[in-house]
């Protein structure tokens, strides 16, 4: 497949949904490269607890943006966009971007607006007001932006007014500029969303964390905690790390750690699914599980679109 005809495949879904297996199948079929879009799998110390693919899991295929960030760094969506832009510029194998961090996919397709930080006094002024008064003011000052937002969405209404007051420009202006220079602008994009039935997903989640505890997760957390890092860093908040920190401090039993981390993972998966229903409804494929028949359909679609 020539580069100019090469599509970009996006695979999203909640944690433990089987995304990696689908990404591998597509990468094998099209001699592609698998690119990480999971905010925790970027950290070098989080192999087990982030469910990052191991070397055998990678099956000899190129995998990039996995385990390349030290835990002392607060990796951001902006850093991910910068890194992946460099990868795509190399015009290498077909990109198969896979992960559960919805904001990464949104930034790749819609761009990442570089909005100046609002003045703290302006922010404080708007954040103490009601949604009704915020909406009324925004409707008068920036009707187009107001019509895009729910009248009850206090946070977004406040944000729009903070930016308008601080910069003199509509938040929509910044977002339109970002969209014009979005990472995947002008590329052929194929989007696949994978979401198993909830009972199956939760069963997988529970089983997976139990396996993590016996397959190196405890030792991994212990080594991370020895670094003495700020507990507010993203890597320190990875599911399993705070719970195991409590265990090592003598504040939780291992059974409690397991239950708490499983519950936290289920809640995280639920948030991912809620986010996807709002933002990924137009994706070409919505599938419940990876199967041979589904893979054939996806392969044919990629060939036809590619």
Regions found by a protein language model. Name each.
Residues 1-306:
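Phosphate/pyrophosphate-binding catalytic cores of soluble transferases and nucleic-acid-acting enzymes
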């Amino acid at each position: 497949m020539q580069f100019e005809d090469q599509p970009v495949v996006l695979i999203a879904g909640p944690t433990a949904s089987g995304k990696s297996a689908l990404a591998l199948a597509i990468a094998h079929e099209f001699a592609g490269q698998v690119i990480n879009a999971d905010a925790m799998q970027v950290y070098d110390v989080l192999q087990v607890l982030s469910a990052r693919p191991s070397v055998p899991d990678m099956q000899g295929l190129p995998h990039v943006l996995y385990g390349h960030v030290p835990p002392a760094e607060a990796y951001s969506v902006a850093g991910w966009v910068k890194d992946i832009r460099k990868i795509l510029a190399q015009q290498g194998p077909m990109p198969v971007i896979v992960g559960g961090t919805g904001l990464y996919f949104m930034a790749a397709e819609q761009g990442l607006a570089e909005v100046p930080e609002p003045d703290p006094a302006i922010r404080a002024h708007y954040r103490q007001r009601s949604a009704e008064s915020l909406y009324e003011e925004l409707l008068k000052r920036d009707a187009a932006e107001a019509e895009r937002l729910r009248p009850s969405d206090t946070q977004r209404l406040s944000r729009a007014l903070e930016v308008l007051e601080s910069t003199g420009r509509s938040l929509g202006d910044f977002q339109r500029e970002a969209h014009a220079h979005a990472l995947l602008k002008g590329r052929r994009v194929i989007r696949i969303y994978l979401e198993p039935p909830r009972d199956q997903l939760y069963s997988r989640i529970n089983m997976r964390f139990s396996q993590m505890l016996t397959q190196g997760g405890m030792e991994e957390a212990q080594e991370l905690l020895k670094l003495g890092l700020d507990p507010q860093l993203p890597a320190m908040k990875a599911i399993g790390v705070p719970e195991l920190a409590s265990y090592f401090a003598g504040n939780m039993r291992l059974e409690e750690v397991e239950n708490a981390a499983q519950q936290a993972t289920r809640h995280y998966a639920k948030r991912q699914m809620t986010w996807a229903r709002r933002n990924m409804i137009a994706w070409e494929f919505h599938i419940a599980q990876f199967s041979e028949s589904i893979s054939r359909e996806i392969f044919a679609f990629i060939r036809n679109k590619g």
